[in-house]
């Protein structure tokens, strides 16, 4: 039986099985198997561009990557046209095999790369065609922008979410708070910091590990809300990505005010109309907010800081990250930094590599 058939068989069995106390462990086991087969299906994705690595630590010029996901004709091209410069000047992305047209959104001195993944995400989890590349690309995103058509049913959103869920992309979710380590010997040791309030029992954990042929491991569940699904995610950690998602409803000009109001109240959601030029600024601001980037202005000795060309780094970055962003080897030459701004105790503060910088700090770096 091919993997696709195996997946189908498990999905069918899951659909047939009634959900109750007596079956929850069996369902958990099936979910574990399903996760494994889905992974196999996507196994050669690593070599197909995008890579799925950490993507962006401190990217070259502070770029972040946003991927647009949506069904055809929801208005992705229109949105790209409105908020980006049409073509990327930077060609350091590896999606040449995709027909996506990356654009650059210039905002607050940052260059944010926006990649349109044409409506081919659909079917990716079934291993269809270029879907895998799309998935690999989506994995490297700092933010997923799900573009939805306000005039269409909620089905679009649910189906895209499910598609991403199936390939291991978790939207707006924290990593489960479970410590897990494979061991050489000693059997499986499971500890809960407080009794689980969900279906995640010691028995379930052991059963799933056995199915994965893992016979020695230490598991510490630190959150009583963790479920079997969370545990499966933890043991498949290399294939999971926790990505923020912003839901953007386009074409609000074509629905009633009540409907717009209802959509706009959903979490992580912005409403807009490309055609009427409504809400586009909100989309840009929300992208910026969700990316949670910091701007750092560099300053040479005796000269005013350069305020029009900040280095953009992830929020909570250190001077070390900043150095790495400037050049791979810069850290080795680093002597000290002078920092002005809200992260500094006094202005300027002399700091080392581990100092955490705030948004809009001014930094002078001194080399040996
Ligand atoms: N009523 C309305 N129509 C819109 C709006 N934005 C886009 N459209 C229309 O929706 C259609 C699709 O827009 P595109 O921007 O091409 O959509 P897309 O998602 O890029 O489509 P694909 O290229 O097929 O993936 C076009 O006919 C647009 O005129 C809007 O805000 N309101």
Swiss-Prot record:
GO biological process: cytoplasmic translation; positive regulation of cellular response to amino acid starvation
Location(s), subcellular: Cytoplasm
Limits of the TGS domain: 292-367
Pfam families referenced in this protein's UniProt entry, alphabetically: MMR_HSR1, MMR_HSR1_Xtn, TGS
Molecular function (Gene Ontology), one example: GTP binding
One GO cellular component term noted in the UniProt record for this chain: cytoplasm
Modification Phosphoserine occurs at: 364
Function summary: Involved in ribosomal function.
Misc. comment: Present with 6200 molecules/cell in log phase SD medium.
Protein name per UniProt: Ribosome-interacting GTPase 2
Species annotation: Saccharomyces cerevisiae (strain ATCC 204508 / S288c) (Baker's yeast)
Gene: RBG2
